[in-house]
């Protein structure tokens, strides 16, 4: 028995001596200067109409996290001779700009109303940054909700429970709260908080009560 245990113990000691891979470095939030205060106040309910704006940060910008106020819109990013057009799909939009390798970017929003703009260096992004994926064609669970708060009020336990178990969950809303900007942001913030990563499907029916 000792002859069997000794080689196993020796192997375990060797493994314990191996270097452990370092954890991902957290992405530093970069300070943006020269912008309207409404774009950096962290308040989704304030907004500024943005045409071409210049972003200047205190470090190389790897990603931009853009919070549209109520409607998504295509925008263009430029730096030097390089230009990229971004087709917005999400109200809370994360965009990779690491290819520009610059601390200064010119972004043309074409008059879109923007609530907030965040800039990050390379690394693991903070939890509040929402990296949405496109809605699923096939899901393990499909949750239909009449209003944006019904999913949290009546299914608040279901969503985090199955999301934590790796289930692909798609949420569908029958009403679009275009007349209530706050609820559109609360909808996304609530889903992200409970572990949903696929962007919700939202119909065009208005909400009346």
Predicted segment positions?
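Bacterial N-terminal signal peptides
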Residues: 8-16
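Positively charged n-region of N-terminal signal peptides that target proteins for export
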Residues: 1-4
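Active-site rim/loop-helix segments in enzyme catalytic domains that contact anionic ligands
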Residues: 31-41, 47-48, 92-94, 99-209
């Amino acid at each position: 028995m000792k002859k069997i245990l000794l080689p196993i113990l020796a192997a375990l000691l060797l493994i314990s001596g191996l270097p452990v891979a370092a954890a991902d470095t957290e992405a530093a939030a970069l300070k943006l200067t020269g912008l309207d205060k409404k774009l950096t106040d962290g308040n989704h309910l304030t907004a500024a109409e943005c045409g071409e704006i210049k972003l200047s940060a205190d470090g190389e910008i790897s990603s931009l996290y853009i919070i549209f106020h109520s409607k998504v819109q295509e925008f263009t990013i430029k730096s030097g001779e390089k230009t990229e057009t971004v087709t917005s799909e999400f109200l809370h939009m994360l965009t990779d700009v690491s290819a520009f390798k610059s601390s200064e970017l010119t972004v043309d929003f074409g008059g879109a109303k923007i609530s907030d703009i965040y800039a990050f260096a390379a690394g693991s992004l903070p939890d509040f940054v929402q990296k949405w994926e496109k809605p699923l064609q096939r899901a393990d669970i499909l949750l239909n909700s009449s209003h944006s708060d019904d999913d949290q009020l009546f299914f608040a336990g279901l969503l985090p429970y199955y999301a934590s178990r790796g289930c692909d969950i798609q949420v569908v809303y029958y009403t679009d709260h275009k007349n209530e900007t706050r609820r559109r942001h609360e909808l996304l913030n609530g889903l992200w908080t409970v572990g949903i990563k696929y962007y919700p499907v939202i119909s065009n029916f208005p909400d009346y009560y």
